[in-house]
Amino acid sequence: TPERLVLVQGDTGPGQFLFGDGRVQAVVDFELASLGDPMRELAHIRTRDVWYPTGNLPRWFEYYSEFSGVPIDAKKLSYYSVIAMLTTALALGPVVQKLNPRDEHAEWIAQDVWSKRATAEALAEATGTPLQDTALPQAEHSYVSGLFDALEDNLREEQLPHIDESFRQHRMQMTLRLVAHMRNVAEIGAEIGALEIADMHSLLGHRPKSVKEGHRSMEALVRSADADMDDALIQYFYRHAKREVALMRGGMGRAEHARTSPIN
């Protein structure tokens, strides 16, 4: 139980604050709100900092502590960061599995894969698990690569400059990000899939027939696993997320080279 119970807004970013006359007039978007620990709110701010960077989040946490009188509890903040990162991944799961062509499709894919990586990193931080890096396949320039070169050049250099309406410019840029994802799937998707199956094989003890079948088996394993598997599973989640990010390389938008801000 927190020493000080607060209203946790739960999705705290600049878009949730309405300003007027130089002051905050209202706060909106409370569907994730709850009563809880102040450190949980800071964890949600830590998540949103990737998309709306403050420049020096640890210093802002210090300002918060000085102004509110609430000391920063790094251990609690790490714990709640897992929840905050996972909230986005869980929310976007159904969205990316059935993309709406009229929606922000590439942005949702980018946020989904980044949130998976951030969740794995938050789990590692909270449990003190050193993460091991993983090798990722690099694309060889093939015939398919040349086709994507032509498509991207046409869209970016021939079509986009002649679109005057800002909304349609935005939609074309979203399409270019989706094309980048498609290029990666075409160039390295098979290798990524093979790595994923081999990785799951080492944990499951049997080789799944497909990535989808393997993921179902991994879900069952996670549900039944004891704590002594935590380290191995966290390492797998991280490798899995890194592979997902590799398939979105060049289409990640603001999160292309983003990392979660440290706590202090």
Regions found by a protein language model. Give the residues of each.
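Short beta-alpha connecting loops at secondary-structure transitions
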Residues: 103-110, 133-139, 159-161
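C-terminal amphipathic alpha-helical interaction region
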Residues: 142-173, 177, 184-264
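Active-site activation/catalytic loop segments of kinase-like enzymes and analogous catalytic loops
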Residues: 39-72, 82-104, 111-126
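Short, solvent-exposed segments of well-ordered alpha helices
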Residues: 13, 51, 76, 80, ...
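Short, surface-exposed acidic
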Residues: 70-78, 211
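Charged, amphipathic alpha-helical linkers/stalks
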Residues: 124-151
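Tryptophan-centric aromatic hotspots in well-structured domains and transmembrane helices
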Residues: 9, 30, 44, 77-81, ...
